[in-house]
């Protein structure tokens, strides 16, 4: 009985709506920073894939023809290609890929994505048999991946704080709009001098126009 009474006077819950972020100076700065971060991460993924492909290509002219060398080059090349494609997928993802590929859902979070990039860069610091133009080694590519991971984490922290502030503001606005419930309107109704105006007000609010100018406790009780 009490639950039914509570449901009767329970206000209708409305969905919390977040206002679109106004494009201010801070918005432009954050958008520019996110674009730079994504470009850095795309470069890191591209060079990682290039390193894997070059290692596979080096199998054709290696001087060590042992099975162990072939296996090690194949494993390292596969690892580099896989991690590079993973980085490229994470940075070029769309709303469709986020919903369709549930396995890579952790790549949608800037914090976890940055940690994974740093881990990939740390593994690249190991002695991987890669040297391009006698200058670029796997250590340099690993440093690029680590840089992409660091800036990705910084981006996450900046946007998280801003989005959290927007969410708190949306919740405050929602609570302010939902403040006028049926009970509040019932006991705080306007005082009309004209009974016709009061009846029209009650009809507008969906109430019985026969009970005008009286609150719930002040209404007369009809004896049986």
From Swiss-Prot:
Keywords: Membrane, Transmembrane, Transmembrane helix. One of its GO terms (cellular component) is membrane. It holds the Pfam family COPI_assoc. It is found in: Membrane. InterPro entries: Golgi_TVP15. The chain crosses the membrane at residues 39-59, 70-90, 103-123, 139-159. The keyword ATP-binding does not apply. It is a multi-pass membrane protein. This is Uncharacterized transmembrane protein DDB_G0281339. It comes from Dictyostelium discoideum (Social amoeba).
């Amino acid at each position: 009985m009490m639950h039914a009474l509570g449901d009767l006077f329970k206000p209708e819950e409305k969905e919390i709506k977040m206002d679109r972020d106004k494009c201010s100076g801070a918005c432009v700065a954050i958008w520019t920073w996110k674009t730079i971060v994504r470009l850095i991460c795309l470069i890191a993924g591209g060079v990682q894939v290039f390193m894997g492909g070059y290692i596979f290509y080096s199998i054709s002219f290696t001087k060590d023809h042992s099975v162990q060398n072939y296996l090690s080059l194949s494993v390292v090349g596969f690892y580099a290609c896989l991690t590079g494609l993973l980085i490229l997928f994470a940075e070029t993802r769309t709303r469709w890929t986020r919903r369709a590929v549930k396995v890579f859902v952790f790549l949608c979070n800037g914090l976890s994505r940055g940690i994974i990039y740093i881990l990939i860069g740390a593994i690249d610091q190991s002695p991987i048999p890669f040297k391009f133009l006698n200058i670029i080694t796997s250590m340099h590519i690993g440093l690029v991946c680590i840089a992409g991971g660091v800036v990705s984490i910084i981006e996450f922290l900046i946007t998280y704080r801003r989005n959290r502030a927007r969410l708190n503001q949306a919740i405050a606005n929602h609570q302010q709009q939902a403040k006028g419930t049926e009970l509040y309107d019932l006991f705080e109704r306007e005082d009309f001098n004209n009974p016709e105006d009061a009846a029209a007000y009650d009809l507008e609010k969906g109430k019985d126009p026969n009970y005008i100018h009286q609150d719930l406790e002040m209404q007369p009780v009809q004896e049986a």
